[in-house]
Amino acid sequence: MPKFFLRRVELSLEKPRVERHLAAILAADVAGYSRLMGADEVGTLARLRTHRGELLDPAIEIHRGHIANTAGDSILAEFGSVVDAVSCAVEIQRSMLERNSETPPDQRIEFRIGINLGDVVSEGTDIFGDGVNVAARLESLADRGGICISRQVLDQVEGKLDVTYRELGRQNLKNIAKPAEVFAIHLDAAASPGSRFLATANLKQEIRYCKAPDGVRLAYATVGS
């Protein structure tokens, strides 16, 4: 048998090469999707298409991400920058608050978002791996209209974005071997009613002056909300 033929057979038996890389993964899902579909299937699908076409898909593209997978009410997106991923999520959730302001509560489309930084496996445009699985589990922990992130994400964005965070502690995530430190991004000045966790205080520092009995002018700082 010719040697070149043997070589071709050997190559065909080799396992396909796995492409791995580090990425910021954003997983988004519609809260209460089954209920919304049961109440108004046509209207729900139309509203979801509108939100995606006018907000979600453009926001992901503007923040240099790409959509890896979609399935009904869920979106999986990948970013090369953690800051871009979190900025995108914050823009989406803040914009959805405005979009839902005049929509009846029982018709509102509200997203939960989870973001993780981890190693992923690429297959075409789709991504897989524990990094993706953790992002999906973080999404399930988020409040309606909320964002949950992992410790790895917080370490990359802390001090770089104009948002505060709530520590949710170590959480056992389904089918994930180790507990994960989870944080919720605080999107507005006060915790929303029904929030499962206490919001981090938004503290301000102010310099004030006073005069001592001997006439010396003193400066002091006040810290508070």
Where are these regions (language model features)?
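Catalytic beta-strand-to-alpha-helix segment of the class III nucleotidyl cyclase homology domain
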Residues: L76-L187
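Short hydrophobic/aromatic beta-strand or adjacent loop that forms the aromatic wall/cage
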Residues: P179-V182, Q205, R217
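Intrinsically disordered or compositionally simple regulatory linkers and C-terminal tails
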Residues: M1-R20, I185-I207
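A short loop-to-beta-strand scaffold at the N-terminal edge of the catalytic core in hydrolase folds
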Residues: P213-V223
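Catalytic NTP-binding/metal-coordinating core of nucleotidyl cyclase/transferase enzymes
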Residues: K3-F4, R8-S95
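Residues that act as N-cap/strand-start positions at coil-to-secondary-structure junctions
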Residues: I62, N202-K204, D214
